[in-house]
């Protein structure tokens, strides 16, 4: 009955009045694809497939890409024994027989094909434990419909006895019975018909397309061309283009040469095969308008308009001298991240073109050479992998992170023996996974990245002995041998075609193999840059190429945390962000691409995130220098946010203030504060302007800028900015925090407020006005303090405002954000920071206004038995929770918690998975106690059988826990 009541309220919210409070998960909802909101049809299907007891799908179209998008989930539910039926239409012979074959391979799914030309239904019905979920709308089982296209689907929660369930099941069964069972004989016949229609479609497309038509710039290229025009109008003669692999950098350079009307052009790169392909690209743009030539050691032509060469050839002094320094109007340096080498420097310093363009996917270098300075910090345009996916400049990829083999119970690590890397078990697993995940057209053309040359050679030999055609390429192979191998990989001649190329790192960059449809990674991830470079080898668009398959064998590697950094483009190096990305998966990635991990590999990534020190001085300095090089000046905290770089609070955590960190790196920085003002800056940077809350920071900003403001005016400013009311409690809170009475340190071995230790006067309240205090007023007279103080405020407010866009704000806390105990009690307006050990799992505030509850979900084995409470979620809304030891139902704190709702005492819940996550807890929402589920029980030491009384109770969250975080915490 409870479900029906909740459903009724949810229907009222969805259909009658949006302001009616009800269960969000039961409300009618439009399911669509919206990357900005992190919404995908795929995510909803993923979730419901894993929640249901049985499912029924009917779709007009199914493609291999659509099934691959759901593949990991379909495997999971097969293992769980969740049965399903899928009815597919033969409408227009669009459904892919390869997709049907994959679906038929699942023992738990019954698949039928209906041959009625007017069957165009798209419906998904899920039977849950006590209800049904129905999705009807526009989405077929294709990768674009599930992740990218503008779709319109209605999701309804239904009771078992509802009329809609009866009708939906009846209609499904009627058509399912009309459908035919799919035999191998039928599939073979249908494959012939499917191929016929597919080939007709390809032929029609070719007829409609003039292969010699002049190419036109894509959306990204148009923006970059506009910027390049603008730079030249400002008389700027050099610029850097940062563009992800396969997004059309070379064509862009040709378009810009055309729009600049350059007569003589030089294109320099480090390999001849790239130079030759660049020449072909320019020829497609200019056709017969210009002449083209390769400047080689054997034939150094200089009569052509456009000359293509390598850095090694041209840097020869004799070769350089054949050109006047002003011979070229326009020079292009491809793979510009290499421009710090002596050969490139010699070329760049010799010539004086009217315009110099550098192009790279990865300007970040580890050798301290400043690529940005070389181009005077003029960035013409920047598009990284995630943006390229959004703009559909590359093919979608389906990434599968799978567990590598175990040897004697342990996963392979960086020090694995050669015998284990190339053993029979691993070879068989690589082959099995390659066949299982396959590729878009069932004709594998794979590039396999290994960790050692010997491994690549041996694996190639073992693949060949099993009937595959493969080759191993290393640095010892000539460029001609590499080109021949690439031609064989792309060949349509089955006698000469290669299935696999095994390599180590020679294909990390610059190699263009558009037909690659599978990438296998057999090496630990040592660099997110190299990971993206290797992934990029298969992302270039090509005729009829639908997607790229990526198979990553994940072992017990220290740097597994770099995998989410690379895949999701998150360079904040926030452990919390990385965990959320791994958990959220597909909804966090643009377009039709998907990211899948098996459970063991996912745990290995979590372990790596937990154990990694992401804030070493070396890493901090590296990211600081990267941004400094990019900007051409010392970056401030706000610059890190605006450039999507490392979260700058990490510099504060390491050095007490950002100024302290900068001073430790910049030897010539003459910006020293006196000890008093430095201490004040450190306190504000660390304890107040840390991005966790906003009210005290906003007031601090206003006070420091205006010196005095009336409460009435401040109330108005706060409401206009945040739609939050500012009352007397807020004034008390602000004064307590900003005057540093809350924060405690030790003086003379006693816990003492910072205000009493340092005698800082920050803000005064008099005559209904807030006025700046003398300590802050005097400090702001010092320019260095002024700059770094206001920067920390700008960072804090911006960080908070970025977070609040994507989650609920609940009386001071952002749902699903992480907080330390210190920040939690501050936000809850405790007058003095408590001794956190004394608070333990919960603590009632002195004014009985709140009682924060802390749960470490997975307890450490070495803690005392009296702290090993078995707190656990019974579902996404219900928490089974235990009091402290030596408590009964009559204990004061227990009574206060039981009667919290009656007495308006808030029970905010803070949870972390385990102690490896550090000192921060997720805020999950506020709790309400179920007075009908209170039990006195015991907690017992299993060793000595000693017991202590405790109280067990059920509590309900104000909002069901978000699915991905729920899974992360409980698994």
Describe the residue ranges of each PLM region.
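Conserved interdomain linker/interface between the two RecA-like ATPase lobes of SF2 helicase motors
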Residues: 379-447
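PLD/PLD-like phosphodiesterase catalytic module centered on the HKD motif
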Residues: 1-218, 222, 337
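Conserved segment of the helicase C-terminal RecA-like domain
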Residues: 528-533, 537-567
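Post-DEXD/H (motif II) to motif III coupling segment of the RecA-like Helicase ATP-binding lobe
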Residues: 338-397
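Conserved strand-helix element at the start of the C-terminal RecA-like helicase core
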Residues: 265-274, 420-466
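Conserved helicase ATPase core of P-loop NTP-dependent helicases/translocases
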Residues: 294-295, 299-300, 319, 457-458, ...
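Long, largely alpha-helical accessory region at the distal end of helicase-like NTP-driven motors
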Residues: 196-219, 228, 429, 435-436, ...
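Walker A/P-loop
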Residues: 233-257
């Amino acid at each position: 009955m409870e479900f029906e009541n909740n459903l009724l309220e949810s229907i009222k919210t969805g259909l009658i009045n949006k302001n009616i409070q009800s269960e969000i998960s039961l409300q009618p909802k439009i399911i669509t694809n919206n990357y900005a909101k992190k919404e995908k049809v795929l995510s909803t299907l993923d979730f419901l497939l894993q929640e249901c007891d049985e499912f029924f799908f009917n779709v007009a179209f199914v493609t291999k890409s659509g099934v691959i998008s759901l593949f990991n989930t379909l495997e999971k539910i097969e293992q769980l024994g969740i049965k399903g039926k899928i009815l597919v239409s033969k409408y227009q012979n669009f459904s892919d027989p390869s997709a049907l074959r994959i679906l038929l391979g699942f023992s738990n799914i019954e698949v039928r094909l209906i041959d009625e030309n007017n069957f165009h239904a798209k419906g998904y019905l899920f039977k849950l434990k006590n209800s049904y979920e129905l999705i009807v709308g526009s989405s077929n089982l294709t990768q674009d419909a599930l992740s990218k296209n503008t779709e319109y689907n209605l999701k309804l929660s239904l009771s078992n006895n509802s009329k809609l369930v009866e009708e939906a099941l009846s209609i499904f069964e009627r058509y399912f019975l009309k459908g035919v069972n799919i035999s191998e004989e039928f599939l073979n016949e249908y494959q012939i018909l499917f191929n016929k229609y597919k080939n007709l479609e390809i032929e029609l497309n070719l007829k409609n397309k003039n292969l010699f038509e002049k190419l036109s710039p894509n959306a990204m290229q148009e923006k970059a061309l506009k910027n390049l025009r603008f730079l030249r109008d400002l008389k700027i003669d050099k610029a850097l283009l940062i563009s992800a692999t396969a997004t059309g950098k070379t064509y862009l350079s040709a378009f810009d040469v055309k729009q600049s009307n350059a007569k003589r052009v030089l294109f320099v790169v480090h390999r001849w095969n790239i130079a030759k392909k660049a020449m072909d690209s320019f020829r497609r743009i200019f056709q017969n308008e210009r002449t083209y030539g390769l400047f080689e050691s054997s034939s150094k032509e200089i009569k052509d308009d456009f000359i293509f060469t390598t850095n090694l050839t041209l840097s020869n002094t004799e070769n350089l001298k054949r050109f006047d320094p002003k011979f070229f109007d326009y020079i292009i340096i491809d793979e510009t991240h290499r421009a710090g080498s002596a050969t490139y420097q010699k070329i760049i310093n010799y010539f004086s073109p009217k315009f110099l363009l550098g192009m790279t996917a990865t300007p970040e270098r580890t050798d301290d050479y400043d690529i940005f300075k070389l181009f005077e910090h003029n960035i013409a345009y920047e598009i990284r992998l995630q943006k390229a996916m959004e703009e559909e400049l590359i093919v979608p990829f389906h990434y599968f992170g799978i567990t590598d083999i175990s040897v004697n119970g342990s996963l392979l690590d960086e020090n694995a023996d050669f015998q284990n890397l190339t053993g029979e078990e691993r070879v068989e697993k690589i082959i099995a996974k390659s066949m299982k995940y396959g590729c878009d057209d069932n004709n594998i053309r794979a590039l396999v990245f290994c960790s050692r040359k010997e491994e690549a050679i041996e694996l190639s030999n073992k693949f060949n002995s099993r009937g595959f055609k493969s080759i191993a390429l290393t640095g010892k192979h000539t460029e001609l041998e590499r080109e021949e191998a690439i031609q064989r990989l792309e060949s349509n001649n089955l006698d000469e075609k290669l299935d696999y190329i095994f390599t180590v790192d020679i294909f990390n960059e610059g190699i263009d193999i558009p037909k690659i449809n599978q990438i296998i990674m057999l090496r630990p991830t040592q660099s997110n840059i190299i990971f993206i470079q290797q992934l990029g080898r298969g992302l270039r668009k090509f005729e009829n190429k639908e997607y790229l398959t990526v198979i990553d064998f994940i072992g017990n590697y220290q740097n597994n945390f770099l995998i989410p950094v690379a895949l999701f483009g998150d360079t904040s190096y926030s452990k919390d962000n990385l965990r959320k990305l791994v958990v959220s998966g597909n909804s966090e990635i643009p377009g039709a691409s998907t990211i899948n991990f098996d459970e063991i590999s996912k745990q290995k990534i979590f372990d790596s995130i937990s154990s990694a020190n992401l804030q070493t001085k070396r890493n901090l300095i590296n990211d600081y220098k990267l941004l400094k090089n990019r900007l051409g000046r010392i970056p401030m905290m706000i610059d890190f946010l605006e450039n999507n770089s490392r979260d700058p609070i990490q510099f504060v955590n390491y050095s007490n203030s950002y100024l302290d960190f900068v001073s430790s790196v910049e030897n010539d920085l003459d910006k020293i504060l006196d000890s008093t003002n430095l201490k004040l800056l450190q306190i504000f940077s660390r304890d107040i302007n840390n991005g966790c809350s906003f009210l005290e920071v906003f007031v601090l900003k206003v006070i420091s800028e205006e010196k005095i403001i009336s409460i009435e005016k401040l109330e108005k400013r706060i409401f206009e900015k945040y739609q939050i009311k500012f009352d007397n409690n807020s004034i008390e809170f602000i004064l307590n925090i900003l005057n540093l009475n809350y924060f405690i340190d030790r003086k003379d071995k006693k816990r003492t407020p910072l205000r009493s230790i340092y005698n800082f006067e920050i803000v005064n309240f008099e005559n209904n006005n807030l006025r700046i205090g003398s300590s802050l007023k005097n400090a702001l007279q010092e320019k260095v303090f002024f700059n770094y103080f206001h920067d920390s405020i700008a960072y804090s407010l911006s960080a908070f405002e970025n977070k609040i866009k994507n989650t609920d704000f609940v009386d001071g806390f952002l749902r699903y954000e992480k907080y330390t105990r210190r920040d939690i009690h501050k936000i809850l307006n405790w007058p003095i920071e408590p001794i956190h050990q004394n608070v333990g799992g919960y603590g009632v505030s002195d004014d009985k206004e709140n009682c924060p509850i802390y749960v470490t979900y997975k307890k450490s084995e070495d803690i005392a038995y009296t702290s090993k409470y078995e707190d656990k979620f019974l579902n996404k809304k219900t928490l089974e929770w235990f009091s402290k030891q030596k408590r009964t139902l009559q204990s004061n704190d227990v009574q206060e918690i039981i009667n919290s709702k009656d007495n308006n005492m808030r029970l905010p819940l803070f949870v972390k998975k385990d102690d490896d996550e550090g000192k921060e807890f997720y805020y999950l929402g506020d709790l309400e106690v179920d007075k009908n589920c209170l039990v006195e029980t015991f907690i017992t030491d299993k060793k000595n059988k000693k017991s202590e009384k405790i109280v067990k109770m059920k509590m309900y969250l104000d909002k069901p826990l978000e699915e991905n975080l729920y899974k992360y915490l409980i698994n």
